[in-house]
Amino acid sequence: MHHFVPSISLFMASVSFSVFFSHLATSWECSFFRSESFCCKTLFSMVPLINSSFNLSVFLFFNAITSFNLRISCSLLFSSFCRIASVFNKASSWLTMLPPMAPLLS
């Protein structure tokens, strides 16, 4: 039973490291790409869920690096998606404001 303790502590350390790493990477991505904060956090919260499956494997350190590369590529996709979504969001908010303002504009 005692030989399981190091592996459990190693697993707990890897989980805490990945949570801390994900928090740092997410805050960096959200500030670097300057996306809509809600859109940014919603999309980036999916990435640690995908990456959490990697933490079960033996190569914890290498997976952190792989995870970072995965996050960078996801960031580029997500940030462009967030920009498109924010443009549509602003356009739809303008469209909802236009009908009441129509008599004033004409």
From Swiss-Prot:
Instruction: Provide the alphabetized UniProt keywords.
Output: Membrane, Signal, Transmembrane, Transmembrane helix
User: Its principal location?
Assistant: membrane
Listed GO CC annotations:
membrane
Any transmembrane segments, and where?
Answer: 42-62
- The stretch of residues making up the signal peptide is 1-27
Provide the protein's localization. Membrane
Q: Give the highest taxon in the source lineage.
A: Eukaryota
Annotated membrane topology is: Single-pass membrane protein
What other remark does the UniProt record contain for this protein? Overlaps ATG16.
Q: What is this protein called?
A: Putative uncharacterized protein YMR158W-B
